[in-house]
């Protein structure tokens, strides 16, 4: 664990002491090294339990894929941000990269924590850098409103969780995940216990976000700079799913009945947010709502609490993290050239950027779950689980997948096909940096098809 954590912490002096000329090169190289070292976690010494462990930090089959995704994303965020942060003063550039690196440190400690209180503290600590990135480097003044929404939604959900955790500590005497899995299941039957159950899960459902408490997400995504959108879509939403899976172990007797309304809400949300996507004119807003739709499926898979549901949820979280991050990068490259996120003003780009149209095509097909890709594997596992629970859910999930295909193709056709407007014919060509960025996003998605056990979690 420390093999990754110590180099990540050493990024901070590197960022502040490197000469301005080499700042971006050094940080990108350093973070790529960290990402390659993190791949070692995939080599589990024991197939089932915790590995790389000390008293407070450990990895297991559930957290490993998410940890590697976190480390993989930092060099990509630094690569994506170069163009629009470069004109700023050097101290601000350093601060920006410092915030990204601190976010990675918090996330590694959140996914690696074995103590639930430590997970909670890191879960909350990720708010601070994200909030600064959104409110300081966002595009329009609306970013302050988005930051407020983001902060208050997440904090309002998290405070009951803290109280619930303290109550759990009082009743079981420990909050270590290593011990809790062997402790006696709690006898939960009163109203107070039901409120306690809700308090444990609401924080994660807000973070995912579940339809109904998702209003902060489109605002935050649309206003954030590209690195903010990438880390929000790829890793921060996954904190919610990860936390739910960890808490479900302790909430076992109650969860069977109380989860029903949340499952229905998640499935209804897939259709509702998908329908909202079909009406969007703003490119980033469309990708943000599609994230809500996918995470609704993940929430359903986790709340069912079967091995297939958990596996499907992890697979879909990893695949969605890479793909939606890639889509935000593509949206940003178009925005940097046309200075507009409105799809009608920047259409027909395929004629000008043919290779980029290929990236758009692959990313969109991955988003709508094309057969060999892991997105489909995750969706099929979750849909099968839900169908086993109640055959009626096939109506909702089937309609949801249909709408997903619809808005993905709509996004591709609106941005790439059609006549090219006269005002965007003189755009600068794509850089190698951007092609590298897309390669590093989409190659892992394609490679995961060949060895999907890496993200099957406990089932494997």
From Swiss-Prot:
<keyword id="KW-0520">NAD</keyword>
<keyword id="KW-0679">Respiratory chain</keyword>
<feature type="transmembrane region" description="Helical">
    <location>
        <begin position="93"/>
        <end position="113"/>
    </location>
</feature>
<dbReference type="GO" id="GO:0031966">
    <property type="term" value="C:mitochondrial membrane"/>
</dbReference>
<feature type="transmembrane region" description="Helical">
    <location>
        <begin position="148"/>
        <end position="168"/>
    </location>
</feature>
<keyword id="KW-0813">Transport</keyword>
<keyword id="KW-1278">Translocase</keyword>
<dbReference type="Pfam" id="PF01059">
    <property type="entry name" value="Oxidored_q5_N"/>
</dbReference>
<dbReference type="GO" id="GO:0048039">
    <property type="term" value="F:ubiquinone binding"/>
</dbReference>
<dbReference type="GO" id="GO:0042773">
    <property type="term" value="P:ATP synthesis coupled electron transport"/>
</dbReference>
<dbReference type="InterPro" id="IPR001750">
    <property type="entry name" value="ND/Mrp_TM"/>
</dbReference>
<feature type="transmembrane region" description="Helical">
    <location>
        <begin position="351"/>
        <end position="371"/>
    </location>
</feature>
<dbReference type="InterPro" id="IPR003918">
    <property type="entry name" value="NADH_UbQ_OxRdtase"/>
</dbReference>
<comment type="function">
    <text>Core subunit of the mitochondrial membrane respiratory chain NADH dehydrogenase (Complex I) that is believed to belong to the minimal assembly required for catalysis. Complex I functions in the transfer of electrons from NADH to the respiratory chain. The immediate electron acceptor for the enzyme is believed to be ubiquinone.</text>
</comment>
<feature type="transmembrane region" description="Helical">
    <location>
        <begin position="61"/>
        <end position="81"/>
    </location>
</feature>
<dbReference type="GO" id="GO:0015990">
    <property type="term" value="P:electron transport coupled proton transport"/>
</dbReference>
<feature type="transmembrane region" description="Helical">
    <location>
        <begin position="114"/>
        <end position="134"/>
    </location>
</feature>
<feature type="transmembrane region" description="Helical">
    <location>
        <begin position="285"/>
        <end position="304"/>
    </location>
</feature>
<comment type="similarity">
    <text>Belongs to the complex I subunit 4 family.</text>
</comment>
<dbReference type="Pfam" id="PF00361">
    <property type="entry name" value="Proton_antipo_M"/>
</dbReference>
<feature type="transmembrane region" description="Helical">
    <location>
        <begin position="394"/>
        <end position="414"/>
    </location>
</feature>
<dbReference type="GO" id="GO:0008137">
    <property type="term" value="F:NADH dehydrogenase (ubiquinone) activity"/>
</dbReference>
<feature type="transmembrane region" description="Helical">
    <location>
        <begin position="308"/>
        <end position="330"/>
    </location>
</feature>
<keyword id="KW-0830">Ubiquinone</keyword>
<dbReference type="InterPro" id="IPR010227">
    <property type="entry name" value="NADH_Q_OxRdtase_chainM/4"/>
</dbReference>
<keyword id="KW-0812">Transmembrane</keyword>
<protein>
    <recommendedName>
        <fullName>NADH-ubiquinone oxidoreductase chain 4</fullName>
        <ecNumber>7.1.1.2</ecNumber>
    </recommendedName>
</protein>
<feature type="transmembrane region" description="Helical">
    <location>
        <begin position="20"/>
        <end position="42"/>
    </location>
</feature>
<keyword id="KW-0496">Mitochondrion</keyword>
<feature type="transmembrane region" description="Helical">
    <location>
        <begin position="195"/>
        <end position="215"/>
    </location>
</feature>
<keyword id="KW-1133">Transmembrane helix</keyword>
<dbReference type="InterPro" id="IPR000260">
    <property type="entry name" value="NADH4_N"/>
</dbReference>
<keyword id="KW-0472">Membrane</keyword>
<keyword id="KW-0249">Electron transport</keyword>
<feature type="transmembrane region" description="Helical">
    <location>
        <begin position="225"/>
        <end position="245"/>
    </location>
</feature>
<feature type="transmembrane region" description="Helical">
    <location>
        <begin position="258"/>
        <end position="278"/>
    </location>
</feature>
């Amino acid at each position: 664990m420390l093999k990754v954590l110590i180099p990540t912490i050493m990024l901070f002096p590197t960022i502040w002491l490197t000469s301005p000329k080499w700042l971006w090169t050094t940080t990108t190289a350093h973070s790529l090294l960290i990402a390659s070292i993190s791949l070692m976690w995939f080599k589990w010494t024991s197939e089932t339990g915790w590995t790389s462990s000390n008293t407070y930090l450990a990895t297991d089959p559930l957290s490993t894929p998410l940890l590697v995704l976190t480390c993989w994303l930092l060099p990509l965020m630094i690569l994506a941000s170069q163009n629009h942060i470069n004109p700023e003063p050097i101290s601000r550039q350093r601060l920006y990269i410092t915030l990204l690196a601190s976010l990675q440190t918090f996330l590694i400690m959140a996914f690696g924590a074995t103590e639930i209180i430590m997970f909670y503290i890191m879960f909350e600590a990720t708010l601070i850098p994200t909030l600064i990135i959104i409110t300081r480097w966002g595009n329009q003044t609306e970013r302050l409103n988005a930051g407020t929404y983001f902060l208050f939604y997440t904090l309002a959900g998290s405070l009951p969780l803290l109280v619930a955790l303290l109550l759990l500590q009082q009743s079981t005497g420990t909050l270590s995940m290593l011990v809790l899995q062997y402790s006696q299941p709690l006898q939960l039957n009163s109203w107070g216990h039901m409120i306690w159950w809700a308090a444990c899960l609401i924080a994660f459902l807000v973070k995912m976000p579940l339809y109904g408490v998702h209003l902060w997400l489109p605002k935050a995504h649309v206003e954030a700079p590209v690195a903010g959108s990438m880390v929000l879509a790829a890793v921060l939403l996954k904190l919610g799913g990860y936390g739910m899976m960890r808490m479900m172990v302790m909430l076992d007797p109650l969860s069977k009945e109380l989860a029903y309304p949340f499952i229905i809400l998640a499935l209804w949300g897939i259709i509702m947010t998908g329908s909202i996507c079909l009406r969007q004119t703003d490119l980033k807003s469309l990708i943000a709502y599609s994230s809500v739709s996918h995470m609704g499926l993940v929430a359903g898979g986790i709340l069912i609490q079967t091995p297939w549901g958990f596996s499907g949820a992890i697979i879909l979280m990893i695949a969605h993290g890479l793909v939606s991050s890639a889509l935000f990068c593509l949206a940003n490259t178009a925005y940097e050239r046309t200075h507009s996120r409105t799809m009608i003003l920047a259409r027909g780009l395929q004629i000008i950027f043919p290779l980029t149209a290929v990236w758009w095509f692959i990313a969109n097909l991955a988003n709508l779950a094309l057969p060999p890709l892991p997105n489909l594997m995750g969706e099929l596992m979750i849909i099968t689980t839900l169908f086993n629970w109640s055959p009626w859910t096939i109506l909702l999930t089937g309609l949801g997948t249909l709408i997903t295909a619809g808005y993905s193709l709509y996004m591709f056709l609106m941005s790439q096909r059609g006549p090219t407007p006269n005002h965007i014919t003189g755009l600068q060509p794509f850089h190698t940096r951007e092609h590298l960025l897309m390669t590093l996003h989409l190659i892992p998605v394609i490679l995961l098809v060949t060895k999907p056990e890496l993200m099957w979690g406990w089932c494997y």
